[in-house]
C-alpha cells in the first residue's frame, strides 16, 4: 500500500494479505462497480474517490481493476470499457492497421457499443451499487438506449441460459434464480460542474435535484426502473441523493493550462493605488489600522460553506448508500413493492470471487470463441454467442428496414415508368428517377448496397426483352428496334427533310445507317418521285465494276496507311499548290454495309410534283456528260499542269485564255486497233473497292461502289431570273430572301495561237464562235453561282459570305460572288430558322448558270474536313465541263467517310471557328475554250490532254 491508504490490484490476481483482510469482513462486503466515461490516458474514473491506478498501469478493454480501503466494507471494482477514450483510441488504431479493410465507422461504432453492453451486464450481476461516471456536465441521453439494450439482452438471452449453466456451480446456489446479487442501485457522478453557475451549496444542490428529476422521469418512462425489483433492471433510492456533481475539486487538471495560469499570475502587476472614495472613508477612522469586524453572520456563513466543501465528496456520497446495504434497507429504500424474501445477497470475498469468475467467463472472456462453442452444449448459450451482437444492433435493423421499403419503391417506380422498348439513356434516366424514389425512405449505411441491388434488378428488367438495339446511325442517333428481335434494317425513328439531286422535290428521309443509304439510295428513290430528276441525265462518275462475285473492300496497312498511294503525289501536290497543308494519313478503313434492294427511306413532300414545268432537255445532249473514265487520284494535279499557263495574275481585271487552232477533222473511220492503250496507272481494280469517298490520298486504282456526288443540268439558263430568284415551284424550301444566285462577271481576253486561224479548217467553226472572234478579243462572261445550305428540317438558303446568310438583293454587291469563289466556304453553318435547337445546315449544292459564250465552265470541288484533314474530290480523272447557257447543280455528299471511319458533323460550331467542321476549298471553277470537235457526252474516251486543258478562274 505504501503511502496510499488503499490497495489496488487487477482481477483476479488478488494479493494474499488483501484477501485475508477481506475474509475478516465476512458477509458484510459491499461491491461497488465504477463504470462510464473517462478522458485521461490511464482511463481512470476513480479520481473522484481519491484513488489512482499504479504508474505502470496499461488500460485494456474488459480489464477489471480492484480498489479496497482498509477499515471499510466497500470493494470498488473499476471497469475499463470502450467508453474510455484511451481504450477507444486503441480500438481505432487496431482497426486502421488491418490490411485491405476500409474503416467502417458504423460497424465500428456498433462493435464498441456491444462490448460496453457486455461489461455493463457483468457489472449488473456482480455489483450491489453501480456508479456511472460522466465527464460532461449533463446527462447523456444515449445511456437510456444502453439500458434498454441491457434489459433486452438480459431478458432474451441471459435468463435463458444462466440458471441452467450456473446450477451446477457454487455461484448458482449463491445468486439464486435471478442470477445476480440484487437489483443494483445506480448512482451518477459528474466530474465537472457548469462554470456559469456559482459553486455555492444552493446552486450545486439545485443542479443535482434538477438532474435527478430528469433522470428519474426518463428511466421510469422507458421502464428501466419500476415499482418491483423483479421487473426492474436497476434501482434508484427513494429518499436519498443519487446524483453527485464535483463542484470543488479539479479531478483531471491540465498541466499545460495550469502552467499558463501561474505564469499569468506572476506577470500580473498589482495596482496598490487606492481609490478616492476609499481615501475619504479612511480619513474618518480614529487611527491608522482601524477596521470593523465582519460580524457573526458572516463567520457562520463562511463556516457552513467550508463544512459543505468538506462533506460534499464522492466518498461520503457513496458511503450513504453502502450503509443502506449493510443495514438491510437496500430494497426498502428503492421500491414501493418490497419482495417477501430479501433479494440482496451480501457474500464474503471468496464467494463473491467465485461468482464473478464464473460470470466473467460466460459473458466476457469466452464470448465469441470457438472453444466455448465446443465445450458448452447449451443451445441458448450458443445462440447468445453467435447472435448477441447482431440482436443488439437495432440501428442496423432499422436502416435495413428503411432500405427495404425504399428498394420496393424504387423498383416499382422504375417498372411503372419503363416503356416497352428503350435504350441506355432512357434506362439511366429511369434509374435516376428510381434512385430518387428510393431516397424518400431508404437511407443509412445499407443504402449504397441497396441502390446497387436496385440497379441490378432494374438492369435485369431492362435486358429481359426490353433492350433497344442502339446501333448508332451516321448522325449519332440510336436504333429503336428491339435488340433481341432480328431486324434487317436499323431505324432510329428520326426523320430528316432533304431535297433530291436537282433540288426541286423535298422528301422525308430516315436517319441513315450506311454510307450507301445516305449518299445514294435516298437520291435514287427521290428520282422516282421527282418529275425533273426523271428527265435529266446526270454526269456519270466512275464507280467500281467487279468482274466476278468475289470482291471485297480494300484493306489498308495498319502501320502506314495509304503510303503507296500518297508518297508520290504528296511531292507533286506540294509543287503545284505550295499553300496547301500536308494531308494527315488515315489509320484504317471501314467495310461498307450490304446493299439493300429497296430503300423505302423517303416519301415526296414537295407540292411541285407533276407541276406544269414541262421542259425538254433536247438540245442539251452535248452538255450532259456521260463518262466513266479510269480513276486517277492525281488527275486534278495533271489537269492543272496542262493549263495554258496564263491566268488572271497577268491582269487585275481580265482572265487570259489561250486559244488553239481548230483540230483537223478526220473523215476516215477510226481503226479500233489504232487507239493507244491507256497508261497502266489508270487501270482500276476489279476485286477491291474503296469503302469510303474518293480523296486525294486514296489508293491508286480503287473506285467506290456507288457515286456520292451528283452533277446534273436541270435546264437552260433562262430558267433562272435574277429579279425573282429561285421560285418555289422550281426549287422548294428556300428561306425568304435567301433564294438568289450571285452574279459573277468574269472579264476574259482571248489570246490567239501563233498561226492564223483563217485556214482551210475555218469553215468548220460555229457561227457563234466566229462572231465572237470577229467582234473582238475581249468579252465579259456573265455567270451566276450559288452556295446552297440545307438543314435537317428542309430549310435551304444561300450564303453571300462565309459568315453571312443572303438576305435579299441588298446583300449582293458587284464583287460579292468574286470574293465568294476565291474564299473557303464552311461545310456547316447554323441554320437561321430560329428554332429552339441549334440546327446546323450543311453545304449540299452548288448552283452554276453558265454564260452564252464559246467557253466551258470547269468544276473541280475539293472538300477538306476531318481531324486527319481528308480532301475529298469528285473522283474523275479530269474535271467535268459544263455546257454553255445552262443551269447546272452539283450536289455534294450528305455524309463523308474516309478510309477508316465516318467523319461526323460537329455538334456545335463556335462563331470564331466556323471552318472547324470542314470547308470547301476556294478556286473550284475553271474555264476552257469550247471545242466543237469534242463529244462531251463521252469525255472518258477522249484524250486526257484535250479535256484537261483549262484555265482556273
Swiss-Prot record:
Keyword Ribosomal protein: no
Keywords: Nonsense-mediated mRNA decay
Polar residues bias locations: 595-604
Signal peptide range: none
Ranges of biased composition (kind: Acidic residues): 573-586
Compositionally biased tracts (Low complexity): 634-653
Region (Disordered): 571-604, 629-653
Pfam families: Smg8_Smg9
GO biological process entries: nuclear-transcribed mRNA catabolic process, nonsense-mediated decay
Role played: Involved in nonsense-mediated decay (NMD) of mRNAs containing premature stop codons. Probable component of kinase complex containing nonC and recruited to stalled ribosomes.
Protein family per UniProt: Belongs to the SMG8 family.
UniProt-recorded name of the protein: Nonsense-mediated mRNA decay factor SMG8
Organism this protein belongs to: Drosophila pseudoobscura pseudoobscura
Amino acid at each position: 500500500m505504501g503511502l496510499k491508504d488503499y490497495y489496488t490490484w487487477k482481477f483476479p490476481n488478488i494479493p494474499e494479505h488483501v484477501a485475508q483482510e477481506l475474509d475478516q469482513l465476512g458477509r458484510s462486503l459491499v461491491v461497488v462497480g465504477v463504470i462510464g466515461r473517462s478522458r485521461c490516458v490511464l482511463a481512470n474514473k476513480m479520481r473522484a474517490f481519491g484513488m489512482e491506478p499504479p504508474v505502470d498501469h496499461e488500460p485494456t478493454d474488459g480489464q477489471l481493476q480492484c480498489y479496497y480501503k482498509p477499515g471499510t466494507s466497500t470493494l470498488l471494482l473499476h471497469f475499463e470499457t470502450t467508453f474510455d477514450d484511451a481504450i477507444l483510441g486503441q480500438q481505432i488504431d487496431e482497426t486502421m492497421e488491418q490490411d485491405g479493410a476500409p474503416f467502417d465507422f458504423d460497424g465500428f461504432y456498433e462493435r464498441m457499443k456491444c462490448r460496453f453492453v457486455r461489461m455493463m451486464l457483468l457489472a449488473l450481476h456482480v455489483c450491489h451499487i453501480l456508479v456511472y461516471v460522466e465527464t460532461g456536465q449533463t446527462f447523456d441521453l444515449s445511456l437510456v438506449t444502453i439500458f434498454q439494450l441491457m434489459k433486452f439482452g438480459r431478458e432474451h438471452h441471459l435468463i435463458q441460459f444462466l440458471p441452467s449453466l450456473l446450477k451446477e456451480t457454487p455461484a448458482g446456489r449463491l445468486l439464486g434464480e435471478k442470477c445476480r446479487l440484487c437489483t443494483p442501485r445506480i448512482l451518477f457522478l459528474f466530474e465537472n460542474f457548469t462554470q456559469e453557475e456559482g459553486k455555492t451549496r444552493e446552486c450545486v444542490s439545485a443542479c443535482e435535484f434538477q438532474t435527478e428529476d430528469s433522470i428519474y422521469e426518463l428511466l421510469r418512462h422507458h421502464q428501466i426502473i419500476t415499482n418491483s425489483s423483479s421487473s426492474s433492471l436497476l434501482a434508484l433510492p427513494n429518499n436519498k441523493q443519487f446524483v453527485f456533481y464535483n463542484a470543488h475539486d479539479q479531478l483531471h487538471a491540465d498541466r499545460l493550462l495550469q502552467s499558463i495560469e501561474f505564469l499569468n499570475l506572476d506577470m500580473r502587476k498589482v495596482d496598490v493605488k487606492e481609490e478616492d472614495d476609499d481615501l475619504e472613508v479612511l480619513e474618518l477612522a480614529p487611527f491608522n489600522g482601524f477596521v470593523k469586524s465582519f460580524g457573526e453572520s458572516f463567520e457562520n456563513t463562511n463556516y457552513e460553506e467550508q463544512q459543505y466543501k468538506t462533506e460534499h465528496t464522492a466518498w461520503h456520497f457513496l458511503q450513504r448508500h453502502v450503509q443502506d446495504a449493510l443495514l438491510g434497507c437496500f430494497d426498502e429504500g428503492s421500491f414501493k413493492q418490497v419482495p417477501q424474501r430479501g433479494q440482496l445477497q451480501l457474500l464474503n470475498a471468496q464467494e463473491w470471487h467465485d461468482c464473478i469468475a464464473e460470470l466473467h467467463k460466460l459473458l466476457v472472456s469466452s464470448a465469441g470463441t470457438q472453444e466455448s462453442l465446443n465445450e458448452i452444449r447449451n443451445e441458448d448459450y450458443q445462440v447468445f454467442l453467435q447472435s448477441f451482437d447482431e440482436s443488439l444492433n437495432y440501428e442496423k435493423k432499422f436502416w435495413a428496414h428503411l432500405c427495404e421499403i425504399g428498394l420496393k419503391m424504387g423498383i416499382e417506380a422504375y417498372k411503372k415508368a419503363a416503356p416497352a422498348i428503350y435504350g441506355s439513356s432512357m434506362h439511366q434516366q429511369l434509374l435516376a428517377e428510381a434512385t430518387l424514389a428510393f431516397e424518400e425512405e431508404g437511407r443509412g449505411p445499407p443504402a449504397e448496397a441497396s441502390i446497387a441491388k436496385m440497379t441490378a434488378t432494374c438492369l435485369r428488367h431492362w435486358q429481359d426483352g426490353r433492350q433497344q438495339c442502339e446501333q448508332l446511325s451516321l448522325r449519332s442517333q440510336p436504333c429503336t428496334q428491339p435488340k433481341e428481335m432480328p431486324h434487317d434494317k436499323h431505324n432510329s425513328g428520326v426523320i430528316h427533310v432533304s431535297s433530291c439531286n436537282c433540288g426541286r422535290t423535298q422528301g422525308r428521309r430516315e436517319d441513315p445507317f450506311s454510307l450507301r443509304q445516305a449518299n445514294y439510295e435516298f437520291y435514287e428513290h427521290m428520282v422516282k418521285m421527282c418529275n425533273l430528276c426523271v428527265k435529266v441525265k446526270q454526269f456519270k462518275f466512275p464507280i467500281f465494276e467487279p468482274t466476278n462475285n468475289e470482291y471485297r473492300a480494300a484493306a489498308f496497312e495498319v502501320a502506314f496507311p495509304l503510303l503507296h498511294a500518297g508518297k508520290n503525289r504528296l511531292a507533286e501536290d506540294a509543287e503545284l499548290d505550295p499553300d496547301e497543308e500536308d494531308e494527315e494519313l488515315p489509320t484504317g478503313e471501314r467495310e461498307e454495309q450490304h446493299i439493300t434492294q429497296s430503300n423505302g427511306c423517303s416519301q415526296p413532300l414537295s407540292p411541285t410534283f407533276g407541276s406544269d414545268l414541262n421542259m425538254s432537255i433536247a438540245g442539251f445532249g452535248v452538255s450532259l456528260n456521260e463518262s466513266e473514265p479510269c480513276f486517277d487520284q492525281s488527275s486534278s494535279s495533271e489537269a492543272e499542269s496542262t493549263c495554258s499557263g496564263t491566268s488572271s495574275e497577268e491582269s487585275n481585271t481580265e482572265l487570259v485564255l489561250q486559244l488553239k487552232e481548230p483540230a483537223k477533222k478526220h473523215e476516215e473511220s477510226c481503226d479500233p486497233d489504232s487507239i493507244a492503250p491507256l497508261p497502266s496507272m489508270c487501270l482500276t481494280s476489279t476485286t477491291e473497292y474503296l469503302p469510303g469517298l474518293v480523296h486525294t490520298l486514296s489508293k491508286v486504282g480503287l473506285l467506290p461502289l456507288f457515286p456520292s456526288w451528283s452533277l446534273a443540268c436541270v435546264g437552260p439558263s433562262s430558267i433562272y431570273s435574277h429579279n425573282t430568284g429561285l421560285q418555289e415551284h422550281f426549287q422548294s424550301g428556300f428561306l425568304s430572301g435567301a433564294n438568289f444566285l450571285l452574279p459573277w462577271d468574269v472579264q476574259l481576253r482571248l489570246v490567239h495561237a501563233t498561226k492564223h486561224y483563217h485556214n482551210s479548217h475555218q469553215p468548220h467553226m460555229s457561227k457563234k464562235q466566229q462572231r465572237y472572234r470577229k467582234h473582238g478579243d475581249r468579252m465579259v462572261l456573265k455567270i451566276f453561282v450559288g452556295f446552297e445550305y440545307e438543314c435537317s428540317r428542309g430549310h435551304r438558303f444561300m450564303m453571300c459570305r462565309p459568315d453571312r446568310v443572303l438576305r435579299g438583293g441588298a446583300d449582293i454587291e458587284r464583287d460579292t460572288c468574286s470574293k465568294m469563289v476565291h474564299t473557303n466556304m464552311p461545310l456547316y453553318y447554323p441554320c437561321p430558322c430560329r428554332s429552339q435547337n441549334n440546327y446546323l445546315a450543311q453545304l449540299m449544292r452548288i448552283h452554276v448558270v453558265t454564260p452564252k459564250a464559246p467557253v466551258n465552265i470547269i468544276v473541280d470541288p475539293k472538300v477538306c474536313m476531318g481531324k486527319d484533314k481528308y480532301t475529298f474530290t469528285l473522283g474523275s480523272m479530269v474535271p467535268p465541263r459544263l455546257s454553255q447557257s445552262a443551269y447546272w447543280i452539283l450536289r455534294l455528299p450528305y455524309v463523308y467517310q474516309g478510309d477508316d471511319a465516318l467523319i461526323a458533323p460537329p455538334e456545335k460550331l463556335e462563331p470564331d471557328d466556323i471552318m472547324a467542321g470542314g470547308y470547301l476549298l476556294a478556286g473550284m471553277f475553271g474555264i476552257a475554250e469550247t471545242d466543237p470537235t469534242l463529244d462531251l457526252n463521252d469525255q472518258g474516251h477522249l484524250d486526257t490532254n484535250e479535256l484537261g486543258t483549262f484555265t482556273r478562274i
